[in-house]
Amino acid sequence: MKKCLLFLTTIALILSLSTNAFAKNTSGDLSQKQALQLALSAREHFWNTMSGHNPKVKKAVCPSGTFEYQNLQYVYMCSDLGTKAKAVNYLTPIFTKTAIEKGFKDYHFTVSKGKLAVPIGDGDNLLNWKKSTAKLISKKGSTITYEFTVPTLDGSPSAKRKVTFVKENKKWKVNQFDAVI
């Protein structure tokens, strides 16, 4: 009898803990800390995609050379992001589907010879997102907007950036490809 009671108590405890963890994981809220973490991840994914390579992937093959298309100089993406499907797969955990589609269009990504290519750009900026602060400015259903105050690396005045997060497939995502640059 004692074993049965101990077993039932253990099961009840496990169920209550797992239910609690599940509730926290699917919470409707996106905290300031979570918003900043997601913004930092979006920034990293944006710049990695614009440079054509995720540096965390070892042994990716990066083609050399450039080509011109519609008066823009392009470079092929490295093998880790070398097809549209691979790049979309890399961006999907962070950005909404709409943000990815619009980003590919706005930034003139193209497919040439079966490979994804990106226009050659000028690189990063002087915003220090790691030291930014977030303020909730709008919350409507599955859409939350935070305004970030982002200090600069060179000491000039901080920049203000509004970033909208949308819950897509039960996960918060950034709703604009270049929101965190």
From Swiss-Prot:
Signal peptide: 1-23
Induction line: Negatively regulated by the two-component system YycFG.
Alphabetic keyword roster: Signal
Signal is among the record's keywords: yes
A Pfam family matched in the record: Endopep_inhib
Keyword match tRNA processing: no
Protein name as annotated: Uncharacterized protein YoeB
Organism: Bacillus subtilis (strain 168)
